[in-house]
């Protein structure tokens, strides 16, 4: 299960708007009133006793919220935000930096914003805070988890579902004897 929504802030306080949006989404998904929110030791908010996870982010103009049945992180930036090119050397892996350098100069700001929101969303998903940030993760510039929504670039990352591998060969019960 996954749901993503956003609201324009229109002068609303971003924290208030985020909680209102989250409450609305929770009620739409469950038919119940949103439970109280608690924080994990590193500050990641969660619903105690619930299988639903959420993440909220905002820009100057918009608040975004994502809810899923597994750990999730979301981040957004206004496409008009100018980022120092020096940041690329600090947060990008060598592979990411090569992709960034291959982009025409007039598109590099958006490319850096795309990497930035992916890294922020991953950190929020993991709940590790700054310990897992930012160059412990590596992404491709064309990662499909980044999209443009309105005037923003937005990344949503969900934790992978555990994969159970069956490495055993089929056997007969008599083989165990």
Language model region names:
Residues 1-177:
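Core catalytic alpha/beta fold that binds nucleotide/phospho-ligands
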């Amino acid at each position: 299960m996954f749901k993503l929504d956003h609201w324009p802030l229109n002068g609303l306080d971003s924290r208030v708007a985020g909680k209102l949006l989250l409450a609305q989404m929770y009620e739409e998904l469950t038919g119940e009133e949103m439970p109280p929110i608690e924080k994990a030791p590193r500050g990641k908010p969660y619903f105690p006793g619930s299988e639903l996870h959420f993440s909220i982010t905002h820009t100057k103009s918009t608040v975004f919220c994502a809810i899923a049945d597994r750990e999730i992180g979301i981040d957004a930036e206004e496409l008009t935000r100018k980022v120092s090119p020096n940041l690329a050397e600090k947060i990008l892996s060598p592979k990411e930096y090569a992709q960034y350098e291959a982009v025409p100069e007039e598109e590099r700001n958006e490319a850096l914003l795309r990497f930035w929101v992916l890294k922020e969303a991953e950190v929020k998903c993991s709940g590790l805070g700054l310990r897992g940030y930012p160059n412990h993760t590596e992404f491709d510039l064309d990662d499909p988890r980044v999209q443009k929504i309105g005037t923003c670039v937005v990344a949503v990352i969900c934790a992978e579902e555990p994969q159970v591998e069956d490495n055993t060969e089929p056997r007969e019960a008599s083989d165990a004897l």
